[in-house]
């Protein structure tokens, strides 16, 4: 193996929408999302892989949605969601502040749970391996000081 991989924390994936979206703050069945536009990262990204895995686990596919938009950055997803262009699935820790500020809302899905490990990865035996280990220690120390964030 050419890489070192260390788990930092576990994060929940949630469904997000604009606060003005008809499903904002509601609890729905997965299929109730289908009439809406789905916004997601481009094929080949980890986010895309996670989304396809989530949808597959619930007998869904991107083609079950009324339409979909594939974009290149998470910031573009956030902006489109805030503008009520559609809904998306993202790591909760990435949008927590926007949820707290009320510029985004969560759609709760019956019997839906999706957690992923967030890892720190670097090339083994690289010139920067020792600095990466030091940075990893700093990250772990910082995250442990925050306690259980329910990320």
Predicted regions span which residues?
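Short secondary-structure boundary/capping segments
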Residues: 4-7, 29-31, 59, 96, ...
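Hydrophobic hinge/microswitch elements
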Residues: 60-107
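A late-sequence structural motif
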Residues: 105-148
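Short alpha-helical
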Residues: 45-46, 75-76, 94, 115, ...
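Secondary-structure junction motif
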Residues: 37-60, 129, 136, 146-147
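Flexible hinge/capping segments at coil-to-helix
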Residues: 2-43, 130
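Short beta-strand->loop
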Residues: 4-14, 101-114
């Amino acid at each position: 193996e050419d890489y070192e991989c260390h788990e930092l924390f576990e994060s929940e994936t949630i469904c997000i929408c604009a606060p003005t979206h008809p499903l904002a703050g509601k609890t729905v069945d997965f299929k109730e999302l289908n009439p809406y536009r789905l916004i997601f990262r481009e094929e080949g990204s980890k986010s895309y892989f996670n989304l396809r895995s989530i949808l597959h686990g619930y007998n869904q596919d991107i083609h079950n949605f009324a339409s979909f938009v594939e974009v290149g950055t998470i910031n573009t997803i956030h902006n489109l969601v805030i503008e009520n262009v559609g809904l998306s699935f993202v790591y909760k820790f990435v949008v927590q502040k926007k949820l707290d500020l009320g510029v985004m809302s969560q759609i709760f899905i019956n019997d839906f749970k999706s957690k992923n490990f967030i890892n720190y990865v670097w090339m083994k035996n690289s010139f920067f391996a020792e600095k990466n280990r030091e940075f990893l220690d700093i990250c772990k120390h910082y995250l442990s000081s925050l306690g259980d964030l329910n990320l």
